[in-house]
């Protein structure tokens, strides 16, 4: 057990630290803080902890006579740290008669400590407070130093006081019940204090990280009985005793630092702001990422960024930054906002640069507008004794991954610099393998601290190859080798990022690893690029030698599984070494440990990079093994059996490839650079770069055995190199290319060409480097020629010819391909652009993308370029954010034959205004119009699949972002390469839409179609094989049933058009802002209910599918249900709900696999809303939230048992959880036990307005809550077999109850005009009012006088609710309107008067909506794109028709009329963007190229058509044949029901015709919604209006 420790602060020993010290805690408070009243304050979460209950009981039992104990419990979470909670607590203290001698005891985390401390500081002008912190963060930070505060709506901690506690009693035992993430969160502050003040403690923390994470990750949830209430609670439990010593020390040491700093600077004037290390930047991230990210997580990122800032200034060494980053990762903290797990946790929120800087400007350390940041000098020490001023330019650089390199203008020609590059990656990785296999201790100095070596160190540790520790503040790594005897298989895959060297060396090392009782293999894996890089020659050799290895993904690349029960035999091993010398080195280093001596023969031609093989052999010699080179056989080596003996010290030479960058900088800028630890004795081939490349180009070179100095010629005088074989130094060719780009000579025939050869292996490095250099040099205006094993660079005649990379839209970035060498090379060329311009000329910088990729070998390169070499750098917001806005991601449609791909692809293109390409047709075009069937007969399926894949990859590469719909062949998923391309496109934001239908129907159809290629096997077998592939490759899915009638076909089209608009974001899903409802369906199968679905949804903004009620949960069945519902209800938004049993539903609680599948179906089907229960496992919640796309998430919680009153913390906790998950709507359903529960609910609703909230009580006692709920109230219908929850009401019942309470005022509405005797408006509106239970009345007011309407209705009727205006008042009424809608202004008439209140009125016109909606309802897409429109007639209605056709996106609208002279004034009176073309002669129609697919007839219907007009009309009707949808004509007149225009259009030209009654009802329903806020029940109204 640990001892109780006392830590002094401000001269008093008041901080006590121990474990299980409850008795000491009670005794200390009672003995040293005597009082008549003790008040324990905590939150409800802590009340569940047994240790807290024990403490309260013990406190009560120990009270002296005359003293009392009060307990006050607040709701958990940051929201409680408010003025309101403070006031409530103060009122409680006053009511309880607390006086000046009161002692407040704050037991809890930072929120409780801060708030109770502030109450204590102001109550009775200050009473005593004792802090008992229960979270790690509170123990080491917020409880110490006397800072107290509450939050305000404008910011955190803005109101507070310094009020020192009487005691801070820290009991480690509280941490047993701390949630895992909170525990890890607190470690950020612990690491911070060690980092700024205590290097020894930092080292101790490093060595205990794995113990900590193992224990914390092992936390379990346990059920406990509450000693105070006897209720059963569930709490987290961590086995603190398993790491008690470590936890105690980390808390104690962290407290000591804070106490010492506070003691010397209580009021935070200087020294105390050192405690803000990591906080300046961390707080800025926190401000954006809260509440998803925790304080410590953001501080962790802030520390790394602020450490990088110090390194950028040349103050902190790269090793120290690497150590800090490594320890944070080891304790489970994020080090970058871009880490995959952290991005998912923070729901992919963006952290824009300008917002970060804005947030940083609100920091108490700042002085005015100048920002200050704590700068670290080394681990354990800050630079200076307070924060330092930092410019926005430097902060921008640190905060982004995109770098702006300004011209190298202010660099003096006589500049001389010494640069020491990091240790060689090649030597570092070899040294780690050799030392791990060797025996004894080896101190490795100047080891490269990079991603590659980090992966290697981790692997050596995981495989138990050696014991690893650090000395010299982390600058020296100490490897205690065990001679290979302890190598053991590890269970977790070894992740190697993009570290090629590590992956190749570890593949051979894996052959030496021993099995354990539970583990017989190890897995090596890496990132996406690593999984493309070759490793086959090495694997082939090892397999041939007895090691069993499997590829787990792509043949020839990682990931691989190496079986540890096979043996590395030795003997003769043959290896192809023309691709990578690392294969050779890998086998060489492990060869001494084979079962017999090894003869390694390199076959297949001259090996690549032989110098690296020589390097390995020389290093093996240093570790005690001598390799012999054969004198009789070329490229053959003999390696004896033995084991390495570790030298006591091994110094890693600097990386010669990295040294090429500062040396090239000298060459290009005419300055001098010395690299002091690489000379002609170097083991590395790249050490020749200065001598063999830069010297012949015109540089002065001084090279000793151990150093190299380069002095460049005057700027602009470098000479091209006619030919250089860079095979001994292939990695340096990229540096040579950028030097060559600015080299030129006086020979007019040379074209300034530098020819580089011997570098074929560079095509399979981190990227295809030869192609990368050619592509990016072209952006600077530099031409290149690719060679079979090299590149020619054609230098520019003058540096002034270098261009800033840009395209038609402005500057573009230089791509680095996640390749460190590409990035560092172009950082040099970027600075030469505009470097020769006049000093005062404004020069645009060059943007380099992904600068962090240099972390692979030289994390501090940018710091050296800036601080040592004098380059001006800046950071910038990524360009992709702006460019992606304009990209229109294409849609790829996949699915079985006969799934409807051809038809639906056309609909898709039409709905989105995209271009359509059928890939089978494209295939035929590319193969001389040979059909797919013929091609397959001649060449076979395999060849066809290859070609199909090639074409698909090509179109995606070229047109994936350009708004295309690609219709594919059914078998595209048969090829693994195509499947990968489909998945890659989907993951890059493209739409891969799986179209499917009932397989039985498909089979019947296919067997009767002779035009398609014959199947080799049965259709059902094909479906069974492909079904999984279709699902795996698609990110969206649409079920398209076979349609037997035109009406069904049109309904399906409407439903698909809305679906595709929703998933692509064209149609935004809106959460209703006013009173609204959704109906809850409880059917087990919707197939038989289609007739009832529309009336069931009357008055609702959405419909809920209770998936848990469905007959089965198969993907096809559920998709079909969604399709039926969409078609039947005209795509009313769907709420997809799977209600679990414990939340009151039918779905089994633990069936998480099926639940995940159902959510996947929902998201692929683009449902508008998805109900996500807040009680589900967090991994499922985050998975759904991160995949939600455009779907809105409803976070729901139901209390069916009535366990929680609305003032219980359960609801507060759940609301905070919903905020953290960033759901779109919160849905809480309680149970009303008594009427008062409704009042408590309303108080909750009133205080939780920062998210749309659905909150209702079940049972009949809770009915009132359903009436008062505003947003999306769940309702039932009389047509449902049963309601989904007790107490559910219908829309009509709710409206009637709301009316009786005064919520809806009865209104009187009228149709005005003359004659109106036959007007259908009263029946139209009154039908709607009756169905929806609205109290309004609609009547006729017949008059020809607008003046009378104003007097009697607008001014004279206090219940006036609106008017439908008809002839002759549509123009006259406008003078009395206070506002006109755009439609009313353009159409020039008002048919709808809307009261605005205060005797003000708005004039609108819904005729155009009547026309538009009637057309859409009859199969016309919402966007008709490339189709033209036609209006027949030029009267008043024609203006509404023109407005409607323009709103549908008609690019041109033609208009014809009996009297052509009326056309010109009509066209001139309308906006020019309507693009209206009046047709005066029949002849001019022949020249029209456009398809005309939509028309509106506005001519009188009671007379025959004029011959001239009829002739024009017929010529237009012919043009409907090639429209992208069924050509449709709407008749604006509703009497007679069939007009001459309708007859000729339908019978002679097969146009679909829409009668005027539909326009009438649609415009009336639009009025209905504008007046009442409710969608009108269209079908019922239509039936009522047209039944006579």
Swiss-Prot record:
GO annotation, biological process: amino acid biosynthetic process; aromatic amino acid family biosynthetic process; chorismate biosynthetic process
GO cellular component, one term: cytoplasm
Binding, Zn(2+): 189, 279, 295
UniProt cofactor note: Binds 2 Zn(2+) ions per subunit.
SUPFAM superfamilies linked to this entry: Aldolase (SSF51569), Aminoacid dehydrogenase-like, N-terminal domain (SSF53223), Dehydroquinate synthase-like (SSF56796), EPT/RTPC-like (SSF55205), NAD(P)-binding Rossmann-fold domains (SSF51735), P-loop containing nucleoside triphosphate hydrolases (SSF52540)
Binding site for NAD(+): 43-45, 78-81, 109-111, 114, 134-135, 156, 174-177, 185
Functional pathway: Metabolic intermediate biosynthesis; chorismate biosynthesis; chorismate from D-erythrose 4-phosphate and phosphoenolpyruvate: step 2/7; Metabolic intermediate biosynthesis; chorismate biosynthesis; chorismate from D-erythrose 4-phosphate and phosphoenolpyruvate: step 3/7; Metabolic intermediate biosynthesis; chorismate biosynthesis; chorismate from D-erythrose 4-phosphate and phosphoenolpyruvate: step 4/7; Metabolic intermediate biosynthesis; chorismate biosynthesis; chorismate from D-erythrose 4-phosphate and phosphoenolpyruvate: step 5/7
Subunit structure: Homodimer.
Miscellaneous section: Present with 6420 molecules/cell in log phase SD medium.
Designated name of the protein: Pentafunctional AROM polypeptide
